[in-house]
Amino acid sequence: MGDRANFGLRQNDGNIIFVYGHWAGAGMLAKFANALDYVQDAGRIDDQAYANRIIISQLVGEEWNGTLGWGVTVNYLADNEHKVPVFDFATREVTLYEADWKSGVLTDSIVTFSLNEFIRKYAKTLVGV
């Protein structure tokens, strides 16, 4: 039950913060691209502490007060049903990985994009009403 996905933020020291979304799989690459686009447009992509918080906030959205649905881990994947996109602050690249969620680790890299390539390919225009 669910559509489990993880999003990775590789820190300058090599550690990876993973954001787990229990129902985040549908449109996950667009969600991640929109979050990265937002933080880049805000001028905070080079400020890792702020960028981490902004990206996580964009992914979680209005669900902050809930007790289910989202989690955060460091260097360990939570339950997962999809490929895992990881943004690397040092290289400004997004790599899509295979993952072994039973072991909690990333395995093979599939494809790597520059930050702007990833945003152009996957970001969706969001219209507020």
Identify what each model region corresponds to:
Residues 10-15, 89-91:
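Short acidic-glycine loop/turn motifs at beta-strand connectors
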Residues 36-129:
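Low-complexity intrinsically disordered segments
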